[in-house]
Amino acid sequence: TLLASSAASDVYKRQGIYVAQEKGYFKEAGLDVSVIQPPDDGATDLVASGGAAFGIDFQDTLAAAFSSDSPLPVTAVAAILQHNTSGLISLKKKGIDSPGKLEGHSYATWDSPIEQAVLKNVVEKDGGDFSRVKLISTYVEDIVAALHADIESVWIYYGWDGVKCDMEGLSTNFLPFADMNPTFDYYSPVIIGNNDYMKKNPDTTKAFLSAVKKGYEYAAGNPSDAADILLKAVPELDEKLVQKSQEYLSKQYIADAAQWGEIDANRWNGFYQWLNENKLVDNALDENAGFTMDYLK
């Protein structure tokens, strides 16, 4: 049995995996795949320890895993979404229609050095003073409630929280990081695999990715059906939100790439180079560190 693991908050991004399960793509490939919930410290540690063969993480958060003194033995093997769909959201009435205007307003931070460096870059590039952004350390669970309370801006993934704000009828400004600085069009999220497992089982790894690719291709072409499959697998999700979210994500799975899952070396390396230059990693990341396209066919 192959175990694939990802955090509950990313459940909607597992879409292709659920489709591959429901449509029998794994079975056709001779694979028995179980999707499991990782512990609080995340999917990457579980995959690194061999507790799961594959998992889901993000290029920005993986940087620490790859650059520590004892790097975690995981590698990114496919991009779930072709572009970084995250950005800053705020209520329109706050007037934050460009990143420099975040000055004097509050922002919900999860206190990651990379997160804050990215934010500082876009604010200052737009002429704002980052030291005058009010950083509030908090984890935002309910985006709508947060924006109505004392949080004026939040870093969100549009495919879930942005869609949720639209559904609730909120009038918002959304500033995508990829538009503010092309260096920040990194891969988020990606499928990672355990290095040792993949080395010993290259054919199984290829078969797994091939089935997952079919799943995401199906989701890209059939968002409504894919949403139903996700709701069947995770019934506690909001039905309308899942439908709208899949409508949005269906255009993001492949977007302008030649095929689903493709990771462009220039974009991958560009972001890690920026982390190196800004001393945001313990040890400099080598070119092409942390990803391979060898298993995706």
Model-identified regions with their sequence ranges:
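Secondary-structure end/capping motifs
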Residues: 199-277
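Flexible hinge/capping segments at coil-to-helix
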Residues: 91-106, 200-202
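Conserved C-terminal helix/tail region of periplasmic/extracytoplasmic solute-binding proteins
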Residues: 268-297
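Pocket-lining segment of extracytoplasmic ligand-binding domains
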Residues: 142-145, 149-234
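Single conserved hydrophobic/aromatic residue that forms the stacking wall/gate
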Residues: 1-8, 12
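Beta->alpha turn/N-cap motifs
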Residues: 39-41, 50-51, 56-64, 113-114, ...
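Short helix-initiation/N-cap motifs at beta->coil->alpha
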Residues: 35-46, 58, 128-146, 158-159, ...
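Ligand-binding cleft/hinge of the Venus flytrap
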Residues: 18-31, 116-135, 163-171
